[in-house]
A protein has these predicted regions:
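Mature, well-folded catalytic/scaffold domains that follow N-terminal targeting or propeptide regions
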Residues: 172-198
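Structured binding/interaction patches within domain cores
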Residues: 19-175, 196
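N-terminal amphipathic/basic-hydrophobic helices that include classical n-h-c signal peptides
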Residues: 1-26
Length: 198
């Protein structure tokens, strides 16, 4: 089983802090040793460009599904929605990876200004956009979207809302990447706040 590095803000597992934030305060959940299944063939891995694009599109769908939670709090801030749009534009070959990554940074900046569901939804959009740079960020978009759904749920319905969001996400998975993503969820579930227990 791969070893993972985790840098969550406020993240804890069994009472133990999991790590630290990156310089900008955003969570980074990536394998210490990169999984070759999430590295494109041209960079020495096994990921086809077509599957890389599908991962990005799925991540964008996950983020867009909860984006209203951000927009209801910050209706005049377009950065997270633009990140999702840039993700889709990258998948169509209309923009460069660097442009998508810049959109991710803008969405993450929007997230840092907030808390709760709105913050998680904006981070989901940022994670989706950075899939263009590192395919393994696909789980970041999904995990943050689930966290947003949990945070937005009333009372003690958060766990149930998270499971429903997780199931919805899995229904959106294209067949070509389904097993890859489900296996990634199994491997990284614990460091992703165990949100993929659905």
């Amino acid at each position: 089983m791969p070893v993972y590095r985790v840098f969550p803000h406020g993240g804890r597992l069994n009472g133990t802090a999991l790590g630290r934030c990156n310089k900008k305060g955003a969570t980074v959940i990536l394998p210490k040793d990169r999984d070759p299944r999430f590295i494109t063939i041209r960079r020495g891995g096994t990921l086809a460009d077509s599957d890389h694009r599908l991962l990005a599109l799925w991540a964008a769908a996950c983020a867009e599904h909860v984006l209203h939670l951000f927009e209801s709090v910050q209706p005049s801030d377009p950065r997270p929605r633009q990140a999702c749009e840039q993700t889709r534009a990258w998948a169509r070959g209309e923009i460069t990876m660097s442009q998508a990554r810049a959109a991710a940074g803008a969405a993450n900046a929007a997230a840092r200004e907030l808390s709760g569901a709105a913050r998680h939804a904006a981070y989901a959009a940022g994670q989706a956009a950075v899939v263009a740079h590192v395919a393994a960020h696909e789980l970041g978009a999904a995990a943050y979207a689930i966290k947003a759904a949990r945070a937005a749920a009333p009372g003690c319905e958060g766990e149930s809302a998270g499971r429903l969001e997780c199931r919805w996400q899995r229904e959106q998975l294209p067949d070509a990447i389904r097993e890859l993503v489900l296996e990634d969820q199994r491997l990284r579930n614990e460091i992703c706040w165990s949100v993929f227990d659905c």
